[in-house]
Amino acid sequence: MASLPRRLLWSVSYIVRESFPIVSKRNCVSLLQGSWRKVLSVGVGTSLCAIPVGQRSEPTLSSESLIKRAASLVADSSSTFLSQTTYALVESLTEYTTAVYTLISLQQKYSSLLDKINSNEESAIWQVIIGARVQINQLKEQYMKYESSWQRAVSLSEMAAEAAYQSGADQASMTVRNHIQIVQTQVQGARDQAHMAEVQLAASQTEEIKRTITEDKGNPPSGGSPRNSLSEEEDIPEAYLRED
């Protein structure tokens, strides 16, 4: 029985040599042996591919780590909200301050030209001044709206900083608190500039009213002067009218 495969191999070799004389005995055997090697290689490769390979999985995060990460994200979001509201408020305060100084300049220029212009020119200048005052009121309403949003953003950031601290995200908490201090300083500086402009505007208006009263005593009003009618409508704080 053991010689049966050998006989079969020689029979196949004989048939191949008879059909293809060029092929020698050695080449025929090599061909058959090479074919078996290829089949064996393919079979082994297929078997290896069928073996399951274990995948590396991420380590499971604890609940504490997830809470800490979430608190840090909340802190970052609150800082972004605070930055946007701070920018809007500071820009609005700056525009308001500029408009106030513009009105002061218009009033001073009007006072210097008062004796050099006629009634028509005086009315035209007062129309410009009235427009400047309307713009100031609009800008004031705008910055007050932004200030409300900014105050809410500060409160939210403070709560986010505290939540981050309680969750163990100390770095995020410290970053938010430092950011709050920085924006508070920026807003306070813009507020101070606006307050200084308001003080100068009130003083300028007070001087204008006093000048008008003095002129009216010497020259009774003929009625219809824009300066007289508008000065009577001015609401000047008592602190600026009181003489110490």
From Swiss-Prot:
InterPro entries: Smac/DIABLO-like_sf, Smac_DIABLO. One of its GO terms (cellular component) is mitochondrion. Homodimer. Acts by opposing the inhibitory activity of inhibitor of apoptosis proteins (IAP). Promotes apoptosis. It comes from the Eukaryota. One of its GO terms (biological process) is neuron apoptotic process. Residues 208-218 have a biased composition (Basic and acidic residues). This is Diablo homolog, mitochondrial. It is found in: Mitochondrion. Residues 208-244 are annotated as: Disordered. Keywords: Apoptosis, Mitochondrion, Transit peptide. Belongs to the Smac/DIABLO protein family. Coiled coil: none annotated. Residues 1-57 form a transit peptide. Pfam families: Smac_DIABLO. A motif (IAP-binding) lies at residues 50-54.
